Amino acid sequence: MIHPLAITMWDFSWIERRWDGAGFEDWNAALDGVKERGYDAVRIDAFPHLLSQAPEKEWLLLPVWYSNDWGSPYKVRVRLFPALIDFLKACRARRIKVALSSWFREDADNVRMALSTPQAMAKCWIDSLRLIADAGLMDTILYVDLCNEFPGDFWAPYFRNDPPWMTWSCWHTDAAMDYMRTAIALVRQEYPDLPYCFSFDGENTHFYRERDLSFFDLAEHHIWMTKLNKQQFYHEVGQAKDGRFTEEAYHLLADHALDVYHGKEKYWKQLLVDGIQTLAADAKVAGLPLATTECWGITDYKDFPMLPWGWVKDLCALGVETACQTGQWALMATSNFAAPQFCGMWRDVAWHQRLTAMIHKATLPPEAEKTSLGRAMRWE
């Protein structure tokens, strides 16, 4: 009998943040930290659009933001092959499963814009999976999320929805559904044993009931208290003039977040509980086991003056406890920040161990056993 797995998100940081002190300069040490804290899996960006184009090329990546601590805050050069293979080998040596996703990071030539068709999307993933298969490492792969938070325009600028203004959380349109269905079908033809999905975020989880996602093997959905009720928490903290992914946004958090949170703490906690329970109920109707690798309290945070971790850890613990009680999650993270670059979160080993133990004791959704996900969660 398998149990739900504890997973952490290492996004594109696993290869972008390799300068001294950035957290991933020593993969062996970082992965030993994963095992020590009780995690079973990591979710990373496989950069399939670049691997497919030229596996051994040194790519110049442009920063997606300067304020957050995911990825590099400045342009950075990476060589993905054989780096991905080396990373997967290090994971397998520790019996750590790897979920593959992509944020489709922008390089100097903006190669990602060629993925406007599902056929192009499928090809880049097939080419990338072939490299992994040729290395004999397919047993390490937990699932493939073809695009992070599709069709958000940060990560899927190549996709034109119908209507075009429908980007974040708007996966339910006919155009988006057709794109996802076709891309997954083509990849599945080549690699039928892997679980597949596109990951989503947003409050419109009722579409799990209304749209046919039977071509998914799991629903990876990202949920945070701060984005519920139309991002009420962020509105009360204050909106940065130049957007959320900025230093101004962190200044507003430092000045106001604790007061806003503690001013009606019970309300914010109940908002999170209600959101998790609603998501679980909607996924159950869809017949899909849930995976959540980005969650539960606040979306953007880091080690910063006047930004303590205590309230974030409290909310995340509540999120894990609530999700475990639903019995709908097969894969569960503890936060957005279970990674070595977030020192204030990562160094609390006992906190991670307590939450990963809670995840391991939860009930596995029966839907997981009915798909390839249940098989991928096991080590032979």
Q: How should each PLM-predicted stretch be described?
A:
Residues 10-24, 62-81, 108-123, 149-150, ...:
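The substrate-binding groove and active-site-proximal loops of carbohydrate-active enzymes
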Residues 2-6, 41-43, 95-99, 139-145, ...:
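Structural preference for beta-strand elements that scaffold enzyme active sites
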Residues 23-107, 119, 130, 169-197, ...:
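Aromatic-lined substrate-binding rim segments of carbohydrate-active enzymes
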Residues 136, 151, 155-325:
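Extracellular glycoside hydrolase catalytic/binding regions
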Residues 59-66, 302-380:
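Aromatic-rich peripheral "rim/lid" segments of glycoside hydrolase catalytic domains that contact
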Residues 1-26, 34, 45-47:
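Boundary/entry segment of secreted carbohydrate-active catalytic domains
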Residues 54-68, 108-130, 156-165, 213-224, ...:
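Aromatic- and acidic-residue-enriched segments that line the glycan-binding/catalytic groove
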Residues 99-112, 126-171:
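Active-site groove signature of glycoside hydrolases
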